[in-house]
Amino acid sequence: MRGHKPTLKEYVLDLYPEPTDLYCYEQLSDSSDEDEGLDRPDGQAQPATADYYIVTCCHTCNTTVRLCVNSTASDLRTIQQLLMGTVNIVCPTCAQQ
């Protein structure tokens, strides 16, 4: 295009930039809430934990025993190694005998 007027009607020459609101409407929490996850003396956060369900058999009567634990993945591996080794779980009925 080399003239003062466009030759094609599709060109829109009267567009202006639209202002964008750069204000962040996020509510900031109190700074004391951020320190709740920092329970270690060195200021590191607690490792992530999750709920795990363990289903095993009673050592005495072989009934199904279900455990629910909240642990880190590495600590759950330790529990698994203990259960595969010498630690045995008994049901509440056998525990009272």
Swiss-Prot record:
<keyword id="KW-0238">DNA-binding</keyword>
<dbReference type="GO" id="GO:0008270">
    <property type="term" value="F:zinc ion binding"/>
</dbReference>
<dbReference type="GO" id="GO:0030430">
    <property type="term" value="C:host cell cytoplasm"/>
</dbReference>
<dbReference type="GO" id="GO:0039645">
    <property type="term" value="P:symbiont-mediated perturbation of host cell cycle G1/S transition checkpoint"/>
</dbReference>
<dbReference type="GO" id="GO:0003700">
    <property type="term" value="F:DNA-binding transcription factor activity"/>
</dbReference>
<keyword id="KW-1090">Inhibition of host innate immune response by virus</keyword>
<dbReference type="GO" id="GO:0003677">
    <property type="term" value="F:DNA binding"/>
</dbReference>
<keyword id="KW-0922">Interferon antiviral system evasion</keyword>
<feature type="zinc finger region">
    <location>
        <begin position="58"/>
        <end position="94"/>
    </location>
</feature>
<keyword id="KW-0862">Zinc</keyword>
<keyword id="KW-0804">Transcription</keyword>
<protein>
    <recommendedName>
        <fullName>Protein E7</fullName>
    </recommendedName>
</protein>
<dbReference type="GO" id="GO:0019904">
    <property type="term" value="F:protein domain specific binding"/>
</dbReference>
<keyword id="KW-0010">Activator</keyword>
<keyword id="KW-1114">Inhibition of host interferon signaling pathway by virus</keyword>
<keyword id="KW-1048">Host nucleus</keyword>
<keyword id="KW-0805">Transcription regulation</keyword>
<keyword id="KW-1078">G1/S host cell cycle checkpoint dysregulation by virus</keyword>
<keyword id="KW-0863">Zinc-finger</keyword>
<dbReference type="GO" id="GO:0052170">
    <property type="term" value="P:symbiont-mediated suppression of host innate immune response"/>
</dbReference>
<keyword id="KW-0899">Viral immunoevasion</keyword>
<dbReference type="Pfam" id="PF00527">
    <property type="entry name" value="E7"/>
</dbReference>
<dbReference type="GO" id="GO:0042025">
    <property type="term" value="C:host cell nucleus"/>
</dbReference>
<dbReference type="InterPro" id="IPR000148">
    <property type="entry name" value="Papilloma_E7"/>
</dbReference>
<keyword id="KW-0244">Early protein</keyword>
<feature type="region of interest" description="E7 terminal domain">
    <location>
        <begin position="1"/>
        <end position="40"/>
    </location>
</feature>
<feature type="short sequence motif" description="Nuclear export signal">
    <location>
        <begin position="76"/>
        <end position="84"/>
    </location>
</feature>
<comment type="subunit">
    <text>Homodimer. Homooligomer. Interacts with host RB1; this interaction induces dissociation of RB1-E2F1 complex thereby disrupting RB1 activity. Interacts with host EP300; this interaction represses EP300 transcriptional activity. Interacts with protein E2; this interaction inhibits E7 oncogenic activity. Interacts with host TMEM173/STING; this interaction impairs the ability of TMEM173/STING to sense cytosolic DNA and promote the production of type I interferon (IFN-alpha and IFN-beta).</text>
</comment>
<comment type="function">
    <text>Plays a role in viral genome replication by driving entry of quiescent cells into the cell cycle. Stimulation of progression from G1 to S phase allows the virus to efficiently use the cellular DNA replicating machinery to achieve viral genome replication. E7 protein has both transforming and trans-activating activities. Induces the disassembly of the E2F1 transcription factor from RB1, with subsequent transcriptional activation of E2F1-regulated S-phase genes. Interferes with host histone deacetylation mediated by HDAC1 and HDAC2, leading to transcription activation.</text>
</comment>
<keyword id="KW-0553">Oncogene</keyword>
<keyword id="KW-0479">Metal-binding</keyword>
<feature type="short sequence motif" description="LXCXE motif; interaction with host RB1 and TMEM173/STING">
    <location>
        <begin position="22"/>
        <end position="26"/>
    </location>
</feature>
<keyword id="KW-1035">Host cytoplasm</keyword>
<keyword id="KW-0945">Host-virus interaction</keyword>
<keyword id="KW-1121">Modulation of host cell cycle by virus</keyword>
<dbReference type="GO" id="GO:0039502">
    <property type="term" value="P:symbiont-mediated suppression of host type I interferon-mediated signaling pathway"/>
</dbReference>
<dbReference type="GO" id="GO:0006351">
    <property type="term" value="P:DNA-templated transcription"/>
</dbReference>
<comment type="similarity">
    <text>Belongs to the papillomaviridae E7 protein family.</text>
</comment>
